[in-house]
């Protein structure tokens, strides 16, 4: 009997093992048959902004041509989600203009997105934005599932442009973790959002509802449908990560109502008179005037930006360029301004604006013209001429609006007769407006807006840094040596870096000489600062004799003959020794042709030759250093003299 029982037990065990092995084999066969679904990379167009896509991490394919300036980019390295996804990828260097795949990851919003020029794309600055993103090469991360189609924040998505289907009832898994995504059934009326978070409890399957048509729940508000307590909320996870739920996008609007008028891209400061002489009623008229101007301008990050400084005894910023990004917000801020009282020290206010207002910290964009509109009741109680000159040298276009100016009898009390003409850079009436009385001020709104937006006529925006053709004439003789030659090129790069370089602004060219001459690159070859700096790096050391006279003649023929008529012509010659040929006639010819010549001598250079080469007076145009490593000390002196000379030219 015992033997039978043992036999039966052995049979049962044997059957169990057979079934187990069969099951494992069957499972392996089924696993082999179940092929992993093929991942399809979604395609998007160049104008698709990251903020329109609700996925927090995804791979997309960009088309060619996204380097186009129509596709705006805000920031550098970390981009505001209002940016073009593909434009940002080109700017960052992940893609070139031929397109390709990129990996996009959303991150938290931040303040102070900095604009920069990189890889053929000019990104813009932005004071702050609620969501950011970063881009990298389009290589999938191990263990991360990426969506094959993208979900957009509204039904009017740009998905159709790229062949995508925007789906509101199905959300892609959130990448960034190897854990399985958790699908959350959303509250009534909201859009589905998927998220993974290993430290949060999963919601109950019955927590949501499939009912539709109800008002979406605001972020942070407890939903009755989710029960008590609300331990898990997709809104909380998204906000912590810097993301905004779709219902917030629809109610609070990810993008501003207007990006501003791009045809009037100026950085504008109003200096309003808050002195005691005005009185409350006229101060209110002044504020209404500002409001009307703000409404007419169409303020926004892609158009004009506006700030206000009030002055009396001393100036004070009411709000700066980055404080308000639309006309309505500016209007509301103006209404809150209260009068300071005191004197009418407009000169002190202009100095304050020049030194403090037009800075990156205060939202100055750099590429936009700087405009300061000074409003004066009667006349200033201090001098404005010197402060205005310094402002113009800094590239600030000054407009003066004088209301109820001094009568003939009152002019004897003025510190500075004709103060408005002394303040502006043109006395042709373009920069100064005279208003007979405060009740006529409203008539000035349209004329002023038209003038500040006419960037072609803003002569003061043409500064010493954006209005020249600069040709570098570089000594490549044997006495320089390879190491010192690289130091010379660094000096050339340091000088070039100070200028605003483009086809419309400053252009840079360079040639090298020994006994012979060689054009390294002309004025029309590179139109961006980065391209110019890279071209300077590529200049190779030649080695040979020192024929400086022939080099100057060559520069006039090969470089400056192609200079634009409206450009100042600047020649910056660097040499380390005495010339083997005559320099007098070529130098005189350069001066005769209007080429302003700076002569930089190093080590064995002859001071008498430097003085002959340099434009008169030589003390302002000829510089000498005893060794190559000290060349960097000359950079600020050259820049200062270039600007001083530019600003001393007749303006009227």
UniProtKB/Swiss-Prot annotation:
Biased composition (Polar residues): 196-212
InterPro entries xref list: ECM_Assembly_Org, LCCL, LCCL_sf, VWF_A, vWFA_dom_sf
Region described as Disordered: 137-181, 196-231
Keyword Transcription on entry: no
Compositionally biased intervals (Low complexity): 145-158
Subcellular location: Secreted, Extracellular space, Extracellular matrix
Domain VWFA: 267-452, 469-638
Disulfides per UniProt: 46-62, 66-86
Assembly information from the UniProt record: Binds dermatan sulfate and chondroitin sulfate.
Function noted in UniProt: Promotes matrix assembly and cell adhesiveness. Plays a role in spinal cord formation by regulating the proliferation and differentiation of neural stem cells.
Official protein name in the record: Vitrin
The organism of origin for this protein: Bos taurus
Source taxonomy: Eukaryota, Metazoa, Chordata, Craniata, Vertebrata
């Amino acid at each position: 009997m015992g033997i039978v029982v043992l036999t039966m037990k052995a049979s049962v065990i044997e059957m169990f093992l057979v079934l187990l092995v069969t099951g494992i084999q069957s499972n392996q066969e089924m696993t082999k048959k179940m092929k992993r679904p093929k991942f399809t990379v979604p395609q998007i167009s160049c104008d698709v902004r990251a903020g329109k896509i609700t996925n927090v991490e995804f791979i997309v394919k960009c088309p060619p041509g996204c380097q186009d300036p129509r596709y705006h980019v805000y920031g550098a390295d970390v981009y505001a989600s209002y940016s073009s996804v593909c434009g940002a990828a080109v700017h960052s260097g992940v893609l070139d203009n031929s397109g390709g795949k990129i990996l996009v990851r959303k991150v938290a919003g931040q303040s102070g997105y900095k604009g920069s020029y990189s890889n053929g794309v000019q990104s813009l600055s932005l004071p702050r934005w609620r969501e950011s993103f970063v881009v990298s090469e389009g290589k999938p991360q191990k263990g991360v599932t990426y969506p094959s189609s993208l979900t957009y924040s509204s039904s009017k998505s740009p998905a159709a442009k790229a062949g995508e289907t925007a789906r509101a009832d199905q959300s892609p898994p959130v990448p960034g973790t190897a854990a399985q995504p958790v699908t959350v059934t959303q509250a009534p009326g909201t859009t589905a959002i998927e998220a993974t978070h290993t430290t949060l409890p999963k919601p109950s399957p019955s927590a949501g509802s499939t009912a539709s048509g109800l008002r979406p729940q605001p972020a942070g508000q407890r939903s009755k449908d989710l029960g008590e307590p609300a331990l898990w909320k997709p809104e909380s996870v998204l906000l912590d990560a810097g993301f905004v739920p779709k219902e917030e996008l629809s109610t609070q609007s990810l993008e501003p109502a207007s990006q501003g008028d791009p045809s009037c891209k100026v950085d504008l400061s109003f200096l309003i008179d808050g002195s005691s002489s005005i009185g409350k009623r006229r101060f209110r008229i002044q504020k209404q005037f500002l409001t009307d101007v703000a409404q007419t301008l169409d303020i926004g990050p892609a158009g004009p930006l506006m700030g206000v400084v009030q002055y009396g005894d001393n100036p004070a910023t009411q709000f700066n360029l980055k404080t308000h990004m639309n006309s309505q917000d500016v209007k509301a801020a103006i209404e809150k301004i209260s009068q300071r009282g005191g004197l009418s020290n407009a000169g002190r206010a202009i100095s304050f604006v020049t030194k403090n207002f037009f800075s990156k910290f205060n939202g100055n964009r750099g590429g936009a013209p700087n405009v300061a509109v000074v409003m004066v009741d009667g006349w200033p109680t201090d001098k404005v001429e010197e402060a205005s000159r310094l402002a113009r040298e800094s590239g600030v276009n000054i407009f003066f609006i004088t209301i109820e100016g001094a009568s003939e009898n009152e002019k004897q009390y003025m510190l500075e007769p004709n103060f408005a003409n002394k303040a502006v850079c043109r006395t042709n009436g373009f920069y100064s407006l005279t208003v007979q009385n405060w009740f006529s001020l409203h008539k000035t709104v349209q004329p002023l807006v038209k003038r500040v937006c006419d960037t072609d006529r803003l002569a003061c925006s043409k500064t010493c840094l954006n209005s020249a053709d600069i040709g570098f004439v570089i000594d490549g003789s044997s006495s320089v040596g390879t190491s010192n030659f690289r130091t010379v090129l660094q000096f050339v790069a340091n000088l070039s870096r100070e200028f605003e370089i483009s086809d419309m602004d400053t252009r840079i060219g360079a040639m090298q000489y020994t006994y012979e001459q060689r054009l390294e690159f002309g004025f029309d070859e590179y139109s961006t600062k980065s391209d110019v700096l890279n071209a300077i790096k590529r200049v190779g050391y030649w080695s040979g004799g020192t024929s400086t006279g022939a080099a100057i003649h060559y520069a006039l023929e090969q470089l400056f003959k192609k200079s634009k008529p409206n450009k100042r012509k600047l020649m910056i010659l660097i040499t380390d020794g005495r010339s083997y040929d005559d320099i007098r006639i070529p130098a005189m010819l350069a001066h005769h042709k209007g080429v302003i010549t700076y002569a930089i001598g190093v080590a064995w250079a002859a001071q008498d030759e430097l003085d002959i080469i340099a434009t008169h007076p030589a003390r302002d145009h000829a510089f000498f250093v005893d060794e190559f490593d000290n060349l960097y000390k000359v950079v600020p002196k050259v820049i200062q003299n270039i600007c001083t000379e530019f600003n001393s030219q007749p303006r009227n």
